[in-house]
Design a protein with these regions (language model features):
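Sequence-structural signature of mature extracellular/luminal beta-sheet repeat domains
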Residues: 22-382
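Bacterial N-terminal signal peptides
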Residues: 8-17
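Positively charged n-region of N-terminal signal peptides that target proteins for export
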Residues: 1-4
Length: 382
């Protein structure tokens, strides 16, 4: 199937309340200011070891937006996945050869990582002999040397693969969830979701679904915080720093579902999905500011032109935003399974022609968003 649909402005019919807005200026709270009721935080101290009960969920207190798609992208579905594999596509990434990799949630004994050439042809699967079964495929990223990094949320590992698909490094221990604690010689991960890289090759790992389940959090004897976190390692996997989001309020977060590094200044952007916001730190983990959004922040991506993109997950759109959180354009027709729609898109990739790609965790398909060849788009990208 290779269908196209011009991005229009018609909105889908939805069962939840949605607001259409052609212009939105995000609320920005900097150091010393309170986000307050906008994100549902009560300001109270977090519950013992399970901070989830101290947070007001953004889904419940913030009105969602579906914006008119205004960037002129069209939609195509040229990638053929293997017959019989119906798992959702957790993530996609593109290497320097312009080959696309897709990370699929498939059952044990079936492949989960696929490579497609620039003509959309599937050229290989990286098998379980290299990566084992990924209990819950989540984020994926490709570094400057074309190494492939994959996150197994429920297996609690992050794996680094060579461009040829050979396993080079495993961070964490499969099936052992907990803290990374250098003082104990304990190097465990807690539901890793995504990976991002600093300009010097340093690694940032976002971990965050732990906060969704207090019972799960409290049952782990190896974990002392039960909190979402960012782990900072050097390019060889040596520990540098980490910071936690185990309190409500400024400088904290409930989830690290999206993660991106500004290549120009090294600032780390966290997509705090359930609080509908970006939380920004410098490269050393010092809090910079919070930027309140009006949608789920499910994925963040920096394109080859150093532009920032945000996936709204179950809100069914992708936004181009600036580094201050201002929405510059929208792609997608809202939640659904139709053309130009998404049930839950999280992670993206862009080729050198400006085409954008994403998967869907609930649908076994990869969407190619074909960039318009307009003067506006050329101006943006040059």
């Amino acid at each position: 199937m290779n269908r196209h649909l011009v991005a229009g402005v018609a909105l889908v019919s939805l069962s939840m309340t949605l607001t259409v807005a052609r212009a939105f200026s995000p609320t920005i709270a900097t150091v010393g200011q309170a986000v307050g009721a906008a994100n549902g935080n009560s300001g109270a101290e977090p519950c013992a070891r399970s901070p989830i009960c101290a947070w007001g969920r953004g889904r419940d207190v913030i009105t969602h937006e579906v914006r008119p798609p205004d960037m002129g992208f069209t939609y195509a579905y040229p990638f053929a996945l293997p017959d019989g594999l119906t798992g959702g596509i957790a993530a996609v990434a593109i290497n320097s050869k312009q080959h696309l990799f897709a990370f699929q949630r498939n059952p044990a004994g079936t492949p989960q990582l696929f490579e497609f050439d620039r003509n959309h042809q599937r050229v290989r699967a990286i098998g379980n002999d290299a990566i084992g079964h990924q209990n819950k495929a989540h984020g994926m990223a490709i570094d400057a040397e074309d190494n492939i990094w994959i996150c197994d949320e429920h297996g609690d590992t992050v794996m680094k693969l060579s461009p040829e698909g050979k396993l080079l490094m495993t961070l964490g221990i499969k099936g052992q969830r907990g803290d990374w604690d250098e003082s104990k010689g304990q190097r465990l991960l807690w539901q890793p979701l995504h990976v991002a890289f600093a300009p010097n090759g340093d690694i940032y790992i976002g971990m965050g679904h732990a906060n969704e389940s207090p019972n799960d959090t409290d049952k782990s004897p190896t974990n002392s915080s039960g909190a979402a976190r960012v782990l900072h390692l050097d390019k060889n996997g040596a520990y540098i720093n980490q910071w936690f989001g185990n309190k409500a309020g400024q400088g904290h977060f409930s989830m690290v579902h999206g993660l991106a590094v500004n290549p120009d200044n090294g600032n780390v952007y966290i997509g705090d999905r359930e609080e509908y916001r970006l939380v920004v730190y410098d490269r050393r983990g010092t809090f910079v500011r919070t930027i309140q959004m009006r949608n789920l922040v499910c994925g963040l991506y920096v394109d080859p032109h150093h532009q920032l993109w945000m996936a709204t997950g179950q809100d069914g759109q992708i936004f181009r935003i600036d580094w201050d959180g201002n929405i510059l354009g929208a792609i997608g027709n809202g939640p659904g399974r139709g053309e130009g729609q998404f049930i839950e898109s999280n992670y993206m990739a862009m080729d050198l022609e400006g085409n954008l790609y994403t998967g869907d965790t609930s649908v076994a398909r990869i969407t190619k968003m074909v960039a318009p060849r307009s003067e506006r788009w050329i101006d943006v990208h040059t």
